[in-house]
């Protein structure tokens, strides 16, 4: 019996093409692209609720991989997540489950849950007004990282060390309708560790800012290096992934200069693997599909 797997990613994207390539070694697994932006639901027009994108019936798939979550309005994002929940209720297996995507995409919820489960994270606060942000800036030592509460790849992240410059940035965020996620800056050696978890498998890389800066995202120009994680790093990453209800997760760890144990910076429920696959020389896409096939087989 063929397993039909939909991937929420454009056909032109590297990750979809890599999954398509890997699927060719499976005789009983087919991969197709699903368009997040055209997902639709129809109720009362047949015997049951039906789900489509612009080209196919989604409820006819066996599994769905959430590879990307495109930006959109509040209505669009809520509807897309609601549809994922209903597609899952209709019997389509979703990787990662919708609830894990909801948790991990929200830095406040994700990190507060990890803190509640004794997972070490940087001190942070989330506020809604400029005056609260200025007070928090001072409480966190006058050296903070301001991030979008929903965001990825190091975009729109600012390190703030001057109160006037910080206030100006806070006013900009508030004017744009954003809440203010303020994390205490963690001094480190310009590198961090990404641990990629796919079921029982683990992959890892070290990301290095060769220019000596503090941002380590590969998307922002840092270099990926091969890395063998310690068992304690793997255990910490797995605990973080489980707290976020993730079966597939990218977990970022950073070592403060004044500590020997790492902190969890964040958990990504739809992690990319292009950089990590290049440096670890393992077929990550094949592992993703093997995990899906094994899960579907029970």
Indicate residue ranges for each PLM-predicted region.
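Extreme N-terminal starter segment of soluble prokaryotic enzymes
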Residues: 1-6
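Conserved N-proximal alpha/beta basic substrate-recognition cap immediately N-terminal to
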Residues: 10-123
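Short glycine-rich anion-binding loops that position phosphate/pyrophosphate groups of nucleotides
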Residues: 69-71, 150-151, 270
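ATP-grasp fold ATP-binding core
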Residues: 114-115, 137-156, 177-188
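Rossmann-like NAD(P)H-binding beta-loop-alpha module
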Residues: 117-141
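Phosphate-binding site of ATP-dependent enzymes
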Residues: 155-244
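A long amphipathic alpha-helix within ATP-dependent nucleotide-binding catalytic cores
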Residues: 215-262, 286-298
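Glycine-rich phosphate/pyrophosphate-binding beta-alpha loops
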Residues: 268-281
């Amino acid at each position: 019996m063929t397993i039909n797997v939909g991937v929420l990613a454009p056909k032109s994207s590297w990750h979809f093409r890599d999954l398509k390539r890997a699927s060719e070694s499976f005789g009983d697994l087919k991969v197709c692209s699903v368009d997040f932006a055209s997902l639709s639901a129809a109720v009362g027009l047949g015997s049951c609720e039906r789900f489509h994108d612009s080209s196919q019936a989604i409820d006819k798939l066996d599994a769905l991989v959430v590879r990307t979550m495109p930006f959109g309005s509040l209505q669009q994002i809520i509807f897309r997540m609601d549809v994922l929940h209903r597609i899952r209720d209709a019997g389509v297996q979703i990787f990662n489950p919708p609830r894990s995507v909801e948790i991990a995409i929200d830095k406040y919820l994700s990190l507060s849950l990890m803190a509640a489960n004794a997972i070490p994270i940087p001190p942070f606060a989330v506020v809604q007004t400029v005056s609260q942000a200025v007070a928090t800036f001072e409480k966190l030592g006058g050296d903070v990282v301001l991030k979008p509460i929903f965001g990825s790849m190091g975009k729109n992240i600012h390190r703030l060390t001057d109160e006037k410059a910080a206030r100006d940035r806070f006013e900009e965020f508030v004017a744009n309708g954003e809440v203010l996620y303020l994390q205490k800056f963690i001094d480190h050696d310009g590198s961090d560790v990404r641990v990629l978890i796919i079921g029982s498998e683990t992959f890892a890389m070290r990301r290095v800012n060769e220019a000596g800066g503090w941002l380590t995202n590969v998307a922002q120009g840092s270099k990926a290096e091969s890395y063998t994680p310690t068992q304690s790093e793997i255990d910490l990453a797995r605990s973080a992934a489980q707290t976020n209800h993730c079966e597939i997760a990218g977990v970022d760890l950073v070592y403060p200069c004044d500590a020997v144990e790492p902190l969890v910076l964040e958990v990504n429920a739809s992690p990319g693997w292009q950089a990590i696959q290049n440096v670890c020389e393992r077929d990550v896409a094949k592992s993703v599909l093997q995990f899906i096939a094994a899960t579907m087989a029970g």
